[in-house]
Amino acid sequence: MKNKLEAEEVIKLKLVIDQDKELVENKKEAFLYGLAGGMCFDFNKFDDHLFLVGTEEGKIHLCSKAYSGQYLETYEGHYLAVYAVKWNNFHPRTFLSCSADWTIKMWDKNLNRPIMTFDLTCAVGDVEWAPYSSTVFAAVTSAGNLYVYDLKQEKHHHLCEHPAMKKAKALHVSFNKVDPIILVGDERGGVNSFKLSKSLTKGPL
């Protein structure tokens, strides 16, 4: 009986290079140039073979545990590092991403371009879907602010903006799965909790 966790390589991340870019001449440099830096990942809630990987280069890759040698799809829309990718809890094709390029983007996995973009004017460290609704999500930024959206009520603007941290970058956000509470973690190891209003805690859609 094994008493420790063992790592298993699922896929080697390869750079997706635009066709109009020049070829790298040096072989060693070409090898390094061909590897992508992974920043985040998330498994699909409805098909645990499918997962997304966000990269340092701004690309998002759809991968499968059944096909370890290639990407199923590559999504282009961010131009800086992708800090988080999150599948929707109710719709198997929908996911969110956030990036150092100041934006949150919503995607359909069958389309390689974003279907919606939200600009928060500074780096977005994390984004999270609410566990009780398909249209509510929260995000945190390097300025220390917490944003809450509900696409059913307002498709283009946040419903709530609140300073989550004082003089610290907010890095992570998480919904409590039982109570109407959001937790925000910062770069200094601090965690703050916030209670959601009733208008943002409606049941699944």
PLM segments and residue spans:
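Inter-blade linker and blade-boundary elements of WD-repeat/beta-propeller domains
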Residues: 1-40, 61-63, 67-84, 112-126, ...
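WD40-repeat beta-propellers
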Residues: 1-3, 60-64, 104-109, 127, ...
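Loop/turn segments within WD40 beta-propeller blades
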Residues: 33-35, 41-48, 67, 85-93, ...
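Acidic, Ser/Thr-rich intrinsically disordered and amphipathic helical segments
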Residues: 50, 59, 81-84, 94, ...
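Conserved strand-to-loop turn within each blade of WD40 beta-propeller repeats
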Residues: 54-57, 97-101, 140-143, 185-188
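Beta-sheet-dominated scaffold domains
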Residues: 114, 127-131, 138, 144, ...
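Blade-level signature of beta-propeller repeat domains, shared across WD40, Kelch, NHL, RCC1
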Residues: 172-205
